[in-house]
A protein has these predicted regions:
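Phosphate-binding loop/pocket of nucleotide- and phosphate-handling active sites
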Residues: 50-105
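Active-site-adjacent helical/loop segments in soluble small-molecule enzymes
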Residues: 1-70
């Protein structure tokens, strides 16, 4: 993993360290689409990027500095690569049906 991280770090302009709840929110939102959006079944690793964007944009007031640094605005188009399907069905159901790793309000 340290070899891969060196390459990513050299090429990436931003990165985030996230809580389990952020990745789990990504799993939940992707599996429960609105209107005509396609349903995406993903594990936590695959949904982490989407979950991060969802967290930033759903809580804009809290993350204004990060959103500005990324240059995100109403014209932005985001592309996500899901790198993991549902490899652990039991954990997937805990997240989606039972609310595992839900953020405490």
């Amino acid at each position: 993993c340290s070899v891969g991280w060196k390459e990513i770090r050299a090429a990436a302009s931003h990165y985030f360290r996230i809580e389990e709840s952020v990745a789990a929110d990504g799993v939940r939102v992707l599996s429960s689409p609105l209107e005509n959006d396609p349903r995406v079944l993903s594990g936590e690793s695959g949904a982490a990027g989407f979950g991060t964007a969802f967290e930033l944009l759903f809580h804009k007031a809290q993350y204004q500095e990060e959103i500005s640094s990324l240059g995100l605005n109403s014209e932005s188009v985001l592309l996500f690569f899901n790198t993991e399907g549902v490899t652990d069905r039991k954990n997937f159901l805990k997240i989606v049906w039972e609310g595992a790793f839900a953020e405490k309000v």
